[in-house]
């Protein structure tokens, strides 16, 4: 049986993550308050960020930037800005 959470990103009840995917207190906050769907949306944005900004996960500054973007996206409602990227219009 899956667990449900009130997803802070979606602002509604949704299926929660199966396990904590990120370490520490932030990981617990994500596990308790972010849905699978929202995490999937973040993973798409994260991939774009890493590729477009050529982030190196061995670099502590790059990891810190990515973590801040994750918090902004999941908890503060701020979209990820990637220069030159124009999202497709939805009808």
Swiss-Prot record:
A Gene Ontology molecular function term of the record: iron ion binding
BP terms from Gene Ontology: cellular response to oxidative stress
Listed InterPro entries: Fe_traffick_prot_YggX, Fe_traffick_prot_YggX_sf
A Gene Ontology term for the protein's cellular component: cytosol
Keywords, in A-Z order: Iron
HAMAP family reported in the protein's UniProt record: Fe_traffic_YggX
Task of the protein: Could be a mediator in iron transactions between iron acquisition and iron-requiring processes, such as synthesis and/or repair of Fe-S clusters in biosynthetic enzymes.
Family note: Belongs to the Fe(2+)-trafficking protein family.
Record protein name field: Probable Fe(2+)-trafficking protein
Organism of provenance: Mannheimia succiniciproducens (strain KCTC 0769BP / MBEL55E)
Lineage: Bacteria, Pseudomonadati, Pseudomonadota, Gammaproteobacteria, Pasteurellales
């Amino acid at each position: 049986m899956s667990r449900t959470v009130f997803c802070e990103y979606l602002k509604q009840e949704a299926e929660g993550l199966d396990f904590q995917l990120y370490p520490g207190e932030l990981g617990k906050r994500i596990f308790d308050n972010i849905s699978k769907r929202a995490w999937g949306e973040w993973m798409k944005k994260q991939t774009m960020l890493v590729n477009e900004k050529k982030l190196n996960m061995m670099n502590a500054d790059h990891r810190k930037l990515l973590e801040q973007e994750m918090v902004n996206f999941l908890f503060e409602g701020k979209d990820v800005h990637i220069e030159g990227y124009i999202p497709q219009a939805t009808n």
